[in-house]
């Protein structure tokens, strides 16, 4: 009966077109429903992390390239793109970031879930405190911009008045976000939050680029004016003042003060973008409970030589800056003497910093402590930024070396060989300092503080035993050693079981090692501040060195410097932050 009924049904469908059409439409409808449900499931599933990272990274990169394209068009000065167009574009980006930060903070407040996971290594409190100080200086700069707009409001675009207001609001909101949310490890709405965080990263990068471009334009304008006054070149300057009278008496003070605050605003935005990038990398990350612990800061006893040497370096830098800026406007002989003074000072500084970093590396060679290879996005980013920002100075240095060697047989300034020595030492100094900082960041710290006055001997064995010993038994042995042993003395587990040969043994007390490293960190810390101050406030003798201008041409050499000097400024300030972190944890 079943077979007969099935045959009849097939016969009816075959010879009845209406029935066949109904069955066909029913099957196609079922197929569409299955396809729709499958597509719905695939869209509602969690988007793959790598795909979300790639999409958001491409969005941010293209956003940055769009902004840089507008800046390059603005650099032509005679083109259709004006400053108000660039500022309007950046203002829109800041408003979008403000909306995202507001939505994120409101959602965090409304959620009744437990406190989100937080990365203990992201955004140390002292870094956020330093950024707060830089933000205050940025707010002062915004106030000067608003005052400048009020004075010239009759002949300049309204975008120049809206921009500082939005920037001030953006700065205040962003500092609040950094203090209360930068450590969050986001686990909900990951794809949406990736785009929000990466938008904030590249918005700050664009603000950094805008600050660098404005500061460079101001420096180049003064540089051309000085060359014209000294008769070095037949150049023409571009009038950068508005074509109307200022309605207040402090417009010139506002415009002049802006460029003394630009270095702080530039460093603020580049550091914020780095911290937000770490937050972006932490989205969806599973934290390691063992490594995600905040280590205590160590003591600072025995600090004398490092701070003293750093203060001498800082005082020397300020003196060189003042003398250089004064003599630069005088006669050609005094101008050449000022440039020579800078290079002599630079050679002495580079040599001292090479010795300091090399001594720190030698101290590390005296201990048998393994490297920390755990996952830490903040530390990885620190290392990558150190190496990437070194490229600017290295390019500038090797160009100077090529120019000095190429002009060796011809008439050259008196400081040509000093410039060659300075360039080579600059390359060496950054190589050694990078090694010292990176090894310090990756060196594993002991969980217990060592007593500097304890009569212990720090023994070094070659080759190291790390990787041979089973660390799983160390905790058990430590527990047994803590128990008092009757009639016997327990040996410290920090000493090897067998005595070392005399040629492979080096005795250094832990307290002495800590003092040496802390003094080195403090000395390098203040030296990097000194080397940041000079170019940040106008001491840039590379522009006044005729060797590179004759070898590469003025346009090529100026382009190299306009790229290399901002990277060098960031390198010095980033080294300051890294060295202070090493100083606290060593």
Swiss-Prot record:
Proton-selective ion channel. Biphasically modulated by acid and alkali, mediating proton influx and efflux in response to extracellular acid and base stimulation, respectively. May be involved in acid and base perception. Sensor for ammonium chloride (NH(4)Cl) in taste receptor cells. NH(4)Cl acts by increasing the intracellular pH, thereby generating a driving force for proton entry through OTOP1 channel. Plays a role in the regulation of Ca(2+) flux in response to purigenic (ATP, ADP and UDP) stimuli, leading to increase in cytosolic Ca(2+) due to influx of extracellular calcium. One of its GO terms (biological process) is otolith mineralization. Belongs to the otopetrin family. Changing residue 267 to A: Complete loss of proton channel activity. Residues 75-82, 148-157, 218-255, 327-336, 406-417, 538-555 are extracellular. It is found in: Cell membrane; Cell projection, Microvillus. It comes from Danio rerio. It is a multi-pass membrane protein. The lineage of its organism: Eukaryota, Metazoa, Chordata, Craniata, Vertebrata. The gene is otop1. It catalyses: H(+)(in) = H(+)(out). GO terms for molecular function: cholesterol binding; identical protein binding; proton channel activity. The chain crosses the membrane at residues 53-74, 83-106, 125-147, 158-182, 191-217, 256-281, 304-326, 337-362, 381-405, 418-438, 519-537, 556-579. Residues involved in the gating by extracellular Zn (2+) and pH are located in the extracellular loops between transmembrane domain 5-6 and transmembrane domain 11-12. Disruption phenotype: Fishes display the backstroke phenotype. Mutant fish exhibit otolith agenesis without additional effects on the sensory epithelium or other inner ear structures. Otoliths are essential for the perception of gravity and acceleration. Larvae without otoliths are unable to orient dorsal side up and rest mostly on their side in contact with the ground. Residues 484-505 are annotated as: Disordered. InterPro entries: Otopetrin. GO terms for cellular component: membrane; microvillus; plasma membrane. Residues 1-52, 107-124, 183-190, 282-303, 363-380, 439-518, 580-586 are cytoplasmic. Activated by both acid and alkali, with proton influx in response to extracellular acid and proton efflux during alkali stimulation. Inhibited by Zn(2+); this inhibition is thought to be pH-sensitive. Currents evoked in response to mild acid (pH 6.0) stimulus may also be mildly potentiated by exposure to Zn(2+). Activated by NH(4)Cl. Coiled coil: none annotated. Keywords: Biomineralization, Cell membrane, Cell projection, Hydrogen ion transport, Ion channel, Ion transport, Membrane, Transmembrane, Transmembrane helix, Transport. This is Proton channel OTOP1. Signal peptide: none annotated. Homodimer.
């Amino acid at each position: 009966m079943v077979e007969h009924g099935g045959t009849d049904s097939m016969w009816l469908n075959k010879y009845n077109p209406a029935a066949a059409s109904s069955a066909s439409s029913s099957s196609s409808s079922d197929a569409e429903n299955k396809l729709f449900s499958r597509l719905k499931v695939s869209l509602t599933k969690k988007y793959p992390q790598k795909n979300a990272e790639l999409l958001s990274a491409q969005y941010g990169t293209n956003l940055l390239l769009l902004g840089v394209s507008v800046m390059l068009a603005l650099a032509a000065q005679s083109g259709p793109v004006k400053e108000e167009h660039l500022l309007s574009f950046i203002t829109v980006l800041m408003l979008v970031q403000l909306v995202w930060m507001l939505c994120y903070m409101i959602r965090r407040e409304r959620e009744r879930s437990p406190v989100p996971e937080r990365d203990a290594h992201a955004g140390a409190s002292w870094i956020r405190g330093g950024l707060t100080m830089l933000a205050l200086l940025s707010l002062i700069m915004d106030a000067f911009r608003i005052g400048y707009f009020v004075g010239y409001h009759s002949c300049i675009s309204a975008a120049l008045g809206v921009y500082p207001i939005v920037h001030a609001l953006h700065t205040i909101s962003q500092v609040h976000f950094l203090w209360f949310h930068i450590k969050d490890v986001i686990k909900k709405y990951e794809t949406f939050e990736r785009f929000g965080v990466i938008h904030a990263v590249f918005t700050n990068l664009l603000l950094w680029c805008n600050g660098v471009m404005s500061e460079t334009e101001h420096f180049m304008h003064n540089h051309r004016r000085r060359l014209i006054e000294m008769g070095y070149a037949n150049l023409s300057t571009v009038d950068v003042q508005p074509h109307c009278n200022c309605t207040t008496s402090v417009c010139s003070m506002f415009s002049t003060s802006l460029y003394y605050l630009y270095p702080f605003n530039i460093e603020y935005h580049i550091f914020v973008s780095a911290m937000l990038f770490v937050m972006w990398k932490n989205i969806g990350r599973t934290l390691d409970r063992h490594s995600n612990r905040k280590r205590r800061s160590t003591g600072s006893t025995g600090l004398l030589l490092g701070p003293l040497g750093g203060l001498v370096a800082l005082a020397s830098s300020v003196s060189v800056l003042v003398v250089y800026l004064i003599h630069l406007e005088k006669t050609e002989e005094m101008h050449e003497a000022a440039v020579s003074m800078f290079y002599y000072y630079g050679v002495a500084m580079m040599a001292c910093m090479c010795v300091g970093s090399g001594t720190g590396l030698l101290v590390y060679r005296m201990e048998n402590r393994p490297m920390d290879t755990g996952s830490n996005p903040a530390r990885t980013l620190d290392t990558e930024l150190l190496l990437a920002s070194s490229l600017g100075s290295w390019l500038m240095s090797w160009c100077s070396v090529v120019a000095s060697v190429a002009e060796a047989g011809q008439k050259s300034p008196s400081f040509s060989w000093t410039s060659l020595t300075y360039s080579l030492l600059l390359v060496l100094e950054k190589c050694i300092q990078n090694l010292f900082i990176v090894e310090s960041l990756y060196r594993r710290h002991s969980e217990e503080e060592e007593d500097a006055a304890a009569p212990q001997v720090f023994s070094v064995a070659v080759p190291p035993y790390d990787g041979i010993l089973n660390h799983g038994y160390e905790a058990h042995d430590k527990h047994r050693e803590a128990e008092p042993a009757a009639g016997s003395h327990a040996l410290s587990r920090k000493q090897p079981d067998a005595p070392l040969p005399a040629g492979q043994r080096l005795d250094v007390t832990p307290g002495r090692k800590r003092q040496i490293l802390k003094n080195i960190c403090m000395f390098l810390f203040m030296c990097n501040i000194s080397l940041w101050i000079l170019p940040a406030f106008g001491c840039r003798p590379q522009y006044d060195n005729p060797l590179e201008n004759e070898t590469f041409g003025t346009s090529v050499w100026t382009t190299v410097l306009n790229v290399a000097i901002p990277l060098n400024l960031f390198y010095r300030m980033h080294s300051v932050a890294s060295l202070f972190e090493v100083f606290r944890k060593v």
